[in-house]
């Protein structure tokens, strides 16, 4: 009887039937997806996807973690400022166990260094706002400023995306009526709520293209601000590898280059040696030397000091354990003498450990450009220029490239080269692939835990803490762990430069994070069985109950919103706490044999800031937010929150917790290239949605597909052009620059030739013999305070001690800085 009430023509009822059938199809799809995940804690139909509950829990835990950090920083202040220990008070802490009273110049002091802004319970929060880029640049180097500038550009980009997504895309999604009017339904905010016939779906595709354009423009602006520096490119020095190891006379290299390239003038040549063992012995003898100096000074004030040399003596300090006591000064003196003898013996043999690598410095960078161009053509079956001794030096086998910055070179890794390096790299990456892909993908771990009924007892309660917060916390935790595995795999690959190590780490981590945080969970492929069936079984999509429509379930978007919330609050707070580093720091202090070694631990605990790892992690969360910025626009504000908090945490950690790092500019350019992946993923997800919802031949689908192809083609073209442009700038850009003071090319060559050439020698080969005597202790001062020497009154004896202290500090300054992973210049 209902058919009698249809209007003539039957047009309206057909539309109503289409909507009803579509809704029934949506409901059946949801039922199938939820049924297939009935034992999974990831997909659950919760009020508003559990986002309010997860947000409240994260805010509370975030505040608790900040309180814990403030307490730890107040109680163990040295740990909160490890990077400053080396610069400000490592010397006097070593010799006197007290803070330095050395007078500071106005340029050395900063708001972050003052007692009121550095010692308070929560003063570190205000110091972040008062800290200027000039302070960070003077202490941490230009790479830190470039990284922070990159983050600010990403924040600005995310602000624009957030504004557009919340003011335009979100109202369009809410205007749909497919999922009802219940305000607790998270799906109303997603693209799933918009009917397939709605013309506003065009806005989603247009805005995806707009986001890509905005991203490209923003990164182009950041790229134009990157500084080119001569000390980074070292355009007048070439690194030549595959030189026969039996060649020890640099005159042969000079003769060949002069004959093959008559217009080129060689000013200096330095061969490389296997200094791995030598650097290890040097580190150990410096440690022993510091122990001797410390206890010699203490013995002059307090008499003979006895220590227990067993590694567990600090933990089991009672006399019942029976650890033998020895004279501290004598113990470290004998240890230093032994290590010094081994060091000198190894140094005498170092000339026999040539590596077939040489750094050749020319008078002008135009000369190096000629040689690099000739050898780059040699890769295309073009023989480089010959000389009368070509067969002797085997120049046709050489690999010639611009030398990296001296501070960028990891000298101890140069010994791993050739087939040995490639074999090591291939085996490590195969092992990494097997470990990460087959065992420890976070989505697979969460699914495996569900199979063992980890959350089954409370699933019946439909508790958002378990069904939403717990899985996202697990995904975040494993996402934190796995990049560190990737980092250590890059570390054991023995890259020759820190830039190369960081860049490889960044690329591998980013690809891994995108795969395991975005792709697998989005596709619902949370188990290996499901993944391989989807990959290889041609009948899988027809027979299985799990459809790809599950990708666009409302709660799947809520899962990523909750994940970004967890990363924004708990994630950034944990980065501030640095729990793994704190545990290592505590363990090293427990196993230190003496007070002197405790001081050594404090100095050497400050590590380099891992730009590759942090770039990858920042871009992962940015990519998650950008990928779902249109299909699930609620995620964008939390992505912006993450970027802001991440920026503040990194400012603090770079200044206070990590030592300066000098890198090649290529890693910053590579990070810019990877940012463009995010809007491309957004287009790909929108195309996926259009194909599933609208069909592959609909105009919106075709438009999205064409824009995706054009965006990928544009990105590839820009990447290739950037590679070519980088080669030209490396070769010729420095010719157009002048140094400070306006020196000409000839003057600059004369002044800096010797200094530049000497940089290309491992510092351990330039170190003088350590023969130092301790000085008396200066006036007592409470530890952890900074005193202005202008306000203190000293008598003649204290002035004399201060002069002696400054003399000793001058002699030992470079020695103590050698304890850090890199001595920044």
UniProtKB/Swiss-Prot annotation:
Q: Which domain of life is it from?
A: Eukaryota
In this chain, composition skew of type Acidic residues spans: 796-809
**Bias type Polar residues, positions:** 779-793
GO-annotated biological processes: glomerular filtration; glomerulus development
Any one GO MF annotation of this record = osmolarity-sensing monoatomic cation channel activity
- Alphabetized UniProt keyword annotations: Calcium, Cell membrane, Endoplasmic reticulum, Ion channel, Ion transport, Membrane, Transmembrane, Transmembrane helix, Transport
By its UniProt entry, which InterPro entries does this protein fall under?
Csc1-like, CSC1/OSCA1-like_7TM, CSC1/OSCA1-like_cyt, Csc1/OSCA1-like_N
Which ranges of this chain reside in the Cytoplasmic compartment per its record? 76-141, 224-418, 494-497, 591-610, 658-664, 720-825
Q: Where is this region: Disordered?
A: 98-117, 777-825
What residues form the membrane-spanning segments? Answer: 51-75, 142-174, 199-223, 419-448, 464-493, 498-534, 558-590, 611-629, 633-657, 665-693, 699-719
Per UniProt, subcellular location reads as: Endoplasmic reticulum membrane; Cell membrane
User: GO terms for CC?
Assistant: plasma membrane
Protein family membership: Belongs to the CSC1 (TC 1.A.17) family.
Summarizing the function annotation, the protein's role is: Acts as an osmosensitive cation channel preferentially activated upon hypotonic stress. In contrast to tmem63b, does not show phospholipid scramblase activity. Required for the functional integrity of the kidney glomerular filtration barrier.
Spell out the protein name for this chain: Osmosensitive cation channel TMEM63C
Q: Which organism is it from?
A: Danio rerio (Zebrafish)
Q: Which gene does this sequence derive from? A: tmem63c
